[in-house]
Amino acid sequence: MPVPPEVDPSTDPLNDPEITGRKGSRAIPLPRPGAGMSRARRAEILRVDHAGEYAAVQIYRAQRAVFEGRKGKDAIADDLTGMEGHEQVHLSRFEALLNQNRVAPTAALPLWHLAAGVLGAGTALLGEKAAHACTEAVESVIEQHYADQIAELADRDPELARELAQFRAEEMAHHDHAVEHGSREAPAYRLLSSVIKAGCRAAIKVSERV
């Protein structure tokens, strides 16, 4: 199971090498100017992040259901259980933040539930490497999404920025674990990865708005 690095809560996430130093990861952009943010923008951030973590839990859960109990699949089932656990922690935190800020989840949540379950089960049925390719694609979009938010929040809400930095570190650990376990050897890897990434980006846009 991937072990994510701990982020020192006293460290500015913009300068933490564990967050910005991974080879191939686009650097976190400079903070956007201005202090504070509108309630509407904060609601967008919490709503879309809650949706993303909800979908991640469903993907890993569906993949785990395919592999559990199958001969020779104990290792990947255990890995998926661990990663699902990380995502559940993230999801629980965003559920609390939605409640605290009186923000409703995205109206598209039932759609994401179905889509994530199909994606998770479908890639797992294609084999371990396809399941890892799914993880790599999803986490590459999510870690950059978090990077953009960290930049936006660094001066406006540093406490939330630090939480997102820890979550991002865990998403990156999932990504790297997938690559190390053969994600790029999956059948039709480039096509599979491109389609999943496009779907994730579309879901982000929708979840911010509704």
Model-assigned labels for residue ranges:
Residues 1-210:
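Non-heme di-metal
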